Amino acid sequence: MGHRQSVDYTSIPPSELDAHERLPRRKSRFDLFYGWKGIAFLSTLTNVLFISGFFYFGTHLFSPSSSFGHEECHLGSERLWERPVPWKKVVLENHQEFVDGDPWDSKFAGDGTSSNGGAPSPWDSVWLPNWVALENDPAAQGYGFGTPLTGPGSEGNEHDPTPWTPGSQAFGLAVMHQLHCVASIKKAINDYRYTGGHRGSNSSANIGHVDHCVEVLRQATMCHGDMSLIRPNVKGHSYTGYDGWGNEHLCRDWEAIEDIVREHGISFVKGAGMQGWTHLKKGVS
């Protein structure tokens, strides 16, 4: 039986190995990022990301439609105005002239078609047409079913000094409908308060209209859901409920609304050889 020989091995110090005798190191995939090639790669990647981000945010933040903000704040149909109606913070206060004023003495008496010709009424300052025209072919943009102002079944005034463009349609405007209802209810209250209903508020037709307006305002109030906090009134050391004045609310810019309605507002003209929806004369409100 043979004898197993034992051999002792001694490690060679690294310093005694020649450079070409050392085992080659396996290249790492991260070696690409070292040296001038890695710098060039990272620089190119950074530039691509920057340019992509610039175009993305430029398209989404600075496009004409971006000024309308999120759909939570603006309806898609508002793009038909070609400019947004902004929101602004407003502290609401009592305007006693509207409390004391009577819409019967204003354009609201006949929805702008008549007035008593007396002293100016504060209600005249908030009267605007209930109807507007969109002349950028709203049906082609997904907002049709308005009153046609051109083509078959048109209700546009064919003798309007400003011809209607093809595809124009007329629509009511919610804010003016709601304001019309506020004035109608105020008229009915004043009629019963001062004349016992002799101005017509006690007719079945007018009572039905007032009921309709109350329902319109009920739903509009719930729709807008104003969550502004109202501070209570204080008398001495007691809190006595609240009247709602002096608190901040988030409101649409009324001046912007006025500009749009004056630009797009229309009136129904009948007589003098003309009939149909007609552009408002410039400067007329």
From Swiss-Prot:
Coiled-coil residue spans: none
Keyword list, A-Z: Glycoprotein, Membrane, Oxidoreductase, Transmembrane, Transmembrane helix, Virulence
Organism: Diaporthe leptostromiformis (Lupinosis disease fungus)
Metabolic or biological pathway: Mycotoxin biosynthesis
Glycosylation sites: N202
Stored Pfam families: UstYa
Segments traversing the membrane: 32-54
Record's function text: UstYa family oxidase; part of the gene cluster that mediates the biosynthesis of the phomopsins, a group of hexapeptide mycotoxins which infects lupins and causes lupinosis disease in livestock. Within the pathway, phomYe catalyzes the desaturation of the Pro moiety into 3,4-dehydroproline (dPro). The pathway starts with the processing of the precursor phomA by several endopeptidases including kexin proteases as well as the cluster-specific S41 family peptidase phomP1 and the oligopeptidase phomG to produce 10 identical copies of the hexapeptide Tyr-Val-Ile-Pro-Ile-Asp.
Region listing for Disordered, in residue ranges: 143-165
Sequence motif: HXXHC 2, positions: 209-213
UniProt motif (HXXHC 1) ranges: 177-181
Domain free text: The 2 HXXHC motifs are conserved in ustYa family proteins and might form active sites.
Annotated GO biological process: mycotoxin biosynthetic process
InterPro entries: UstYa-like
Membrane association type: Single-pass membrane protein
GO CC terms: membrane
Record-listed E.C. numbers: 1.-.-.-
Family, per entry: Belongs to the ustYa family.
Gene: phomYe
Name recorded for this polypeptide: UstYa family oxidase phomYe
GO MF, any single term: oxidoreductase activity
Subcellular compartments: Membrane
